[in-house]
C-alpha cells in the first residue's frame, strides 16, 4: 500500500484514554510499539500510523482531514465542534461508534457551604471550567447569565483560590471534588470514548481497512459485554433454564454420554450472569455451571 493509503489514527498521548485506546487497537490485531519520546508509531503488520497527540487536538485533526480516524472522549469532541461552528471552521466528522471506556460526566459543583437549589443559584456568579462551550450552551438553555473563568487544569481549586464561585468540570467518582471541599450539583453532559472518522473521501483500499478495523472493534467490544456459559441441565426443566439465561440466543444443547435425562447447554450471554441467576439455575437442577469471559467475537 502506498504512503498516501496508510491509515492515520490519532489517539491521546497521555491521560485517561491513552492506555485503553492502545489496548483496544492491539486487541484488534494491530501490532505496534510505542516509544514515549516519539509522537508517531508505525504498525508492524498493517499499513497504519498511530499519532499520539493532545486529546483536544484530535477532533480538529480528524475534521481537517489530517488523520483518518481518532479515538476521543465525546466531551472533547462536542466542545471542539461547538467552538469550530462559532468560528465557521470545518466541524463535521463521522462518529463510527461509542466505545466501552472513558465514562465520565461534566458537572457543575460548588463549595460545601454554598446553598444550592438549582442552576439558577449560579446567576451572575463566576464559574471556572475547561469546557466553556458546553457550559455556555447549557446555561443559555437554562436562561442563566454567569461569568466564566477559563482554566486548562486544576479547575477544582478555583473556588478555594478565590478565582470562582463554582466550577464545571469532569467527574468520575467525585473524590477529587470532596477533597477540595466541593459537591456535585448538576450533570450537564455525559461522555464515553468514541471513534470518529474524517468526512474526506477515502480511497477504496483505505476505506476497506477502516471497515475491517471497525468490524474488529465491534467484535472486541461485544466480547467484553458477553460471557460464555456452560452447564448441565435436566431435560424436564430445559425450557425454564434457557429462559433464565440473560441475553442468550439459540443456545447449543448437546446430549450427555450415558445420561438421557440431562443435557449440556452452551450459550453466549450478552449480559452479566449474577449470583441470584446462578442460584435460580441450580434450583432448577442445573449443575457444573461455568461462566467464562470471551476474548473476541465475530459474526
Swiss-Prot record:
Keyword Secreted included in the entry's annotation: no
Stored InterPro entries: ATP-PRT_HisG_long, ATP_PRibTrfase_cat, ATP_PRibTrfase_CS, ATP_PRibTrfase_HisG, HisG_C, N-reg_PII-like_a/b, N-reg_PII/ATP_PRibTrfase_C
Principal location: cytoplasm
Record flagged with keyword Lipoprotein: no
GO biological process: L-histidine biosynthetic process
Pfam families attached to this UniProt entry: HisG, HisG_C
Pathway(s) where this gene product acts: Amino-acid biosynthesis; L-histidine biosynthesis; L-histidine from 5-phospho-alpha-D-ribose 1-diphosphate: step 1/9
GO molecular function, one term: magnesium ion binding
Keywords in alphabetical order: Amino-acid biosynthesis, ATP-binding, Cytoplasm, Glycosyltransferase, Histidine biosynthesis, Magnesium, Metal-binding, Nucleotide-binding, Transferase
Entry superkingdom: Bacteria
SUPFAM superfamilies xref list: GlnB-like (SSF54913), Periplasmic binding protein-like II (SSF53850)
Enzyme Commission code: 2.4.2.17
Record text on activity regulation: Feedback inhibited by histidine.
Swiss-Prot/TrEMBL cofactor(s): Mg(2+)
Subcellular location: Cytoplasm
GO CC term, one of those recorded: cytoplasm
Reactions catalysed: 1-(5-phospho-beta-D-ribosyl)-ATP + diphosphate = 5-phospho-alpha-D-ribose 1-diphosphate + ATP
PANTHER family: ATP PHOSPHORIBOSYLTRANSFERASE, ATP PHOSPHORIBOSYLTRANSFERASE ATP-PRTASE
Family: Belongs to the ATP phosphoribosyltransferase family. Long subfamily.
Protein function: Catalyzes the condensation of ATP and 5-phosphoribose 1-diphosphate to form N'-(5'-phosphoribosyl)-ATP (PR-ATP). Has a crucial role in the pathway because the rate of histidine biosynthesis seems to be controlled primarily by regulation of HisG enzymatic activity.
HAMAP family: HisG_Long
Name recorded for this polypeptide: ATP phosphoribosyltransferase
Gene symbol of the encoding locus: hisG
